[in-house]
């Protein structure tokens, strides 16, 4: 029996695509293996958001070729879209598919390796990522995504709800809505729709316990939307915002058309309406022209904000973007600033988690390891409890006895 594995780099949208492919391949009799060094086909869904992402993809191709030389390697995703010839010329790579050829990728694998009889379904993830949107209509000066993903495109309501109902029947209790720019959802549909309209349908699905949103752009969040999310028990109290920076000068250089005052308003109103929510943000350090004063503004803003964690990224020039030719901050300064923000994030997150010591919370089993259950709560607390025998995606109730 032929087998496949999928390695996704980068965003949750890539993860959602891989999740969907895994289900389809299994329904056509191809066995899922988690170990890429043991599978017949290795599909790489690549990322090109940073130079480091590019390097990670190329290193993985080399590792697979060295440790699993008989595997057929397929490369797709954003790095393949940006530089397809790089992989087409690589003798280690069997085939390359651009982002708009991912349906062809699935067809190729099924026609080459599929059977009429499905294999027993093996969950690819403990929570089901569901892609509802792709692409972006904006051109932030640092971002290559619009070039490799195209303009915003939304899935229709009926297709999404049908997919979610099928996942619930398979036993999934939580879905994670993903997209390149979730807040643009529905604007391109006819008639036009919106993310709140879609959520209003999804929350009515029986036996669906949790809906988690991946990343939200504060530029498109109003009080009505925040009120809706905060007031619905099925929508997880977990907000992840694409902030990037808070200094007005740097925000303008990034082409993001928002102010730090608007950021503050959104964050504080979200905290007011959802006091127990986990609130995170993406932050870019070292953007060209970032002065000490700009960084001090960023640090002070984050320190005073209700955010409970942040993902810190070093600025990485991307070919074809408006900022690519600008001189960035020197490496030593950038590393120092990044370290300061990561330490601040660690302290803020510990402070947030300590609030829930001795609390009893529900959650979803992510995995079982060494006779312990790893559980994720709706507000993004990762809890380890003694126990075994619970399959992934099960609902459990836990008491948090200590915080580390």
Where in this protein do the model-derived segments appear?
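Canonical Radical SAM [4Fe-4S] cluster-binding loop centered on the CxxxCxxC motif
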Residues: 125-158
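Cofactor-cradling patches in redox/metallo enzymes
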Residues: 1-108
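Terminal RNA-binding accessory module
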Residues: 325-404
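Radical SAM enzyme [4Fe-4S]-AdoMet core and its adjacent flexible, acidic
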Residues: 11, 185-203, 207, 315-347
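Conserved SAM/AdoMet-binding glycine-rich loop
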Residues: 73-74, 82-83, 169-292
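Glycine/threonine-rich flexible loop motifs
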Residues: 52-60, 153, 249-255
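N-terminal [4Fe-4S]-dependent radical SAM core
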Residues: 97-130
């Amino acid at each position: 029996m032929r087998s496949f594995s999928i390695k996704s780099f980068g965003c949750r949208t890539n993860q959602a695509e891989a999740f969907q492919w895994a289900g389809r391949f299994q329904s056509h009799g191809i066995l899922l293996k988690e170990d890429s060094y043991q599978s017949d086909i290795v599909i790489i869904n690549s990322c090109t958001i940073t130079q480091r992402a590019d390097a990670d993809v190329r290193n993985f191709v080399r590792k697979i070729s060295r440790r699993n030389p008989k595997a057929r390697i397929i490369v797709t995703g954003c790095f393949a879209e940006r530089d397809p010839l790089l992989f087409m010329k690589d003798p280690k790579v069997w085939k390359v598919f651009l982002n708009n050829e991912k349906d062809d990728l699935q067809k190729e694998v099924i026609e080459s390796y599929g059977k009429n009889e499905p294999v027993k379904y093996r969950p690819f993830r403990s929570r089901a990522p569901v892609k509802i949107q792709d692409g972006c209509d904006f051109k932030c000066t640092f971002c290559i995504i619009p070039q490799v993903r195209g303009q915003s495109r939304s899935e229709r309501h009926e297709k999404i709800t049908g997919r979610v109902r099928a996942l619930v029947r398979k036993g999934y209790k939580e879905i994670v809505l993903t997209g390149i720019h979730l807040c643009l959802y529905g604007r391109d549909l006819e008639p036009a729709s919106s993310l709140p309209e879609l959520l209003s349908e999804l929350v009515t699905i029986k036996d669906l316990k949790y809906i988690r949103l991946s990343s939200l752009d504060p530029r498109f969040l109003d009080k009505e939307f925040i009120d809706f999310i905060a007031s619905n028990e099925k929508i997880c109290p977990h907000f992840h915002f694409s902030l990037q920076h808070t200094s007005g000068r740097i925000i303008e250089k990034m082409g993001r058309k928002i102010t730090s005052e608007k950021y503050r308003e959104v964050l504080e109103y979200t905290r007011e309406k959802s006091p127990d929510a986990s609130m995170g943000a993406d932050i870019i350090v070292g953007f060209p022209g970032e002065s000490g004063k700009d960084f001090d503004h960023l640090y002070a803003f984050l320190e005073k904000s209700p955010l409970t964690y942040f993902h810190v990224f070093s600025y990485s020039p991307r070919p074809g973007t408006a900022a690519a030719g600008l001189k960035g901050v020197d490496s030593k300064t950038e590393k120092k600033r990044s370290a300061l923000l990561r330490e601040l994030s660690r302290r803020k997150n510990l402070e947030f988690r300590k609030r829930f010591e001795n609390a009893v919370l529900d959650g979803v089993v992510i995995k079982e390891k060494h006779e312990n259950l790893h559980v994720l709560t709706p507000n993004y607390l990762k809890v380890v409890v003694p126990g075994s025998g619970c399959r992934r995606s099960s609902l459990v109730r836990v008491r948090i006895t200590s915080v580390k």
